[in-house]
């Protein structure tokens, strides 16, 4: 099959899978837990605006291992948002990805981090997200996998489902 002048065998390509960061790959609460009380009070109601908070966060349980397993069958990208009023969040998210997945050209997410408030603009087969009705996820063309839902409460359930679909 030809696509825009490039010869491709569509059936041989991996499906595209986007993965959200906050509360999917990254345990947002772990960053909050590391803040001092003064900062928690100052930023109450908008803790994602705390400068540097994203650098403090730990991975969700087994998230890193699960992603490596999914990479065997899928073409992976991270698709996340970053708070508009917290410029450090944009940098911290990139640094978090480098810390947990590497930063050389052969690393899993090298130049595969997309930060957007319009997830619907990305075309793919699957999106794993904990907020399926926010930031365009509800208009995503592929299937949205609602992380931390009854059907997909954890990474184990997500991996089992997606490995069957690959």
Describe the residue ranges of each PLM region.
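Acidic, Mg2+-coordinating phosphoryl-transfer loop and its flanking beta/alpha structural elements
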Residues: 126-159
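Conserved Lys-Pro-Asp/Glu-containing loop-to-beta segment of HAD-superfamily phosphomonoesterases
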Residues: 16, 108-136
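Active-site neighborhood of HAD-like aspartate-dependent phosphohydrolases
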Residues: 9-57, 151
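Active-site donor-binding segments of glycosyltransferases and PAPS-dependent sulfotransferases
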Residues: 87-119
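Short catalytic/ligand-binding loop motif for oxyanion handling, primarily in non-cytosolic enzymes
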Residues: 26-29, 78, 85-89, 121-123, ...
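Substrate-recognition element of Asp-dependent hydrolases with the DxDx(T/V) motif
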Residues: 58, 63-91, 97
């Amino acid at each position: 099959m030809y696509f825009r002048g490039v010869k491709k065998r569509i059936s041989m390509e991996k499906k595209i899978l986007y993965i959200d960061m906050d509360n999917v790959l990254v345990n947002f609460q772990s960053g909050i837990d590391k803040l001092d009380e003064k900062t928690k009070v100052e930023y109450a109601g908008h803790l994602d605006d705390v400068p540097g908070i994203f650098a403090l966060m730990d991975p969700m349980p087994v998230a890193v291992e699960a992603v490596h397993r999914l990479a065997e069958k899928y073409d992976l990208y991270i698709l996340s948002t970053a708070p508009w009023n917290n410029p450090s969040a944009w940098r911290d998210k990139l640094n978090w990805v480098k810390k947990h997945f590497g930063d050389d050209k052969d690393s899993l997410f090298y130049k595969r981090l997309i930060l957007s408030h319009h997830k619907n603009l990305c075309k793919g087969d699957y999106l794993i997200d904990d907020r399926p009705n926010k930031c365009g996820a509800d208009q995503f063309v592929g299937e949205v996998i609602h992380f931390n839902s009854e059907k997909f409460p954890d990474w184990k359930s997500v991996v089992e489902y997606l490995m069957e679909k690959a």
